[in-house]
């Protein structure tokens, strides 16, 4: 499956202007500038939010209460002599695990550069897997869930939009949950998409520092991947009958 990741860090709100955010992450922006040419584009949707779209496929977003990095394949059209323009992939075609590791490294670096690093604390972390696939190519677990939802109707579902928030086993330190989003458009404009948004909310928020972020993302990555694999197999859906 050609799954792509997103990662997010949620913290107690800190209101910082977009100009100050951009100034604080200058070390990353400078590294992404080669021979005077920026390999990214910056947008400011509102005075307290900054988005950076990198040509490698990652989009970095900073808001008053969260930082997120999402991946999406990017293409550009290149003119050729005597023919139509051809599409060329410019993003990094890495497997899910490689993209996830890159996103985690970047979100840690980005968060530590921000003004919030000294004045806020982290209360939730999220890791997302998003996949486009035809129904015949869906993992068994997703297929079982769709088949169960289709039972009241005699034929196959021509379209659906499902959103489920499921609470997962937790501990005294954290509360886990997963938001399941499964969508099939009512036309041939796109193929179905299924998204698993695994989240860990901390009972007690923790300060922002490199060692803690690396430790938490290491164990959260492991927990999220194990859960995604469990969902794909779908043994727990056998109870659906």
Where are these regions (language model features)?
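A short acidic-to-branched-hydrophobic micro-motif
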Residues: 7-13, 123-130
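Short, conserved charged micro-motifs
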Residues: 18-24, 137-141, 207-213
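Aromatic- and glycine-enriched beta-alpha-beta binding-site module
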Residues: 85-128
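Hydrophobic, Leu/Ile/Phe/Ala-enriched alpha-helical segments that form helix-helix packing faces
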Residues: 28-37, 103-118, 149-153, 220-235
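Short acidic, glycine/tyrosine-flanked loop/strand segments centered on an H-E-D-like triad
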Residues: 67-92, 190-208
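N-terminal low-complexity, intrinsically disordered segments
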Residues: 1-83
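Long, compositionally biased interface segments
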Residues: 187-241
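Aromatic/basic-lined ligand-recognition segments
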Residues: 125-201
């Amino acid at each position: 499956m050609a799954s792509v990741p997103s990662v997010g860090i949620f913290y107690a709100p800190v209101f910082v202007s977009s100009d100050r955010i951009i100034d604080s992450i200058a070390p990353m922006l400078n590294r992404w500038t080669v021979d005077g040419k920026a390999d990214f584009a910056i947008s400011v949707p509102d005075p307290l939010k900054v988005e950076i779209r990198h040509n490698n496929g990652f989009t970095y977003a900073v808001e008053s209460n969260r930082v997120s990095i999402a991946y999406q394949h990017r293409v550009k059209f290149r003119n050729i002599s005597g023919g139509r323009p051809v599409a060329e992939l410019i993003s990094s075609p890495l497997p899910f695990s490689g993209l996830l590791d890159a996103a985690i490294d970047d979100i840690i670096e980005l968060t530590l550069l921000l003004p919030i690093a000294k004045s806020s604390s982290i209360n939730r972390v999220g890791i997302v897997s998003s996949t486009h696939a035809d129904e015949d190519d869906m993992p068994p677990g997703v297929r079982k869930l769709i088949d169960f939802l289709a039972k009241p109707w005699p034929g196959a579902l021509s379209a659906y939009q499902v959103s489920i928030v499921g609470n997962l086993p937790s501990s005294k330190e954290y509360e886990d949950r997963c938001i399941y989003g499964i969508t099939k458009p009512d036309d041939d404009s796109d193929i179905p998409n299924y998204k698993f948004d695994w989240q860990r909310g901390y009972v007690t928020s923790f300060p922002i520092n490199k060692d803690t972020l690396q430790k938490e993302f290491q164990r959260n990555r492991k927990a999220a991947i194990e859960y995604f694999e469990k969902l794909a197999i779908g043994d727990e859906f056998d109870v659906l009958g």
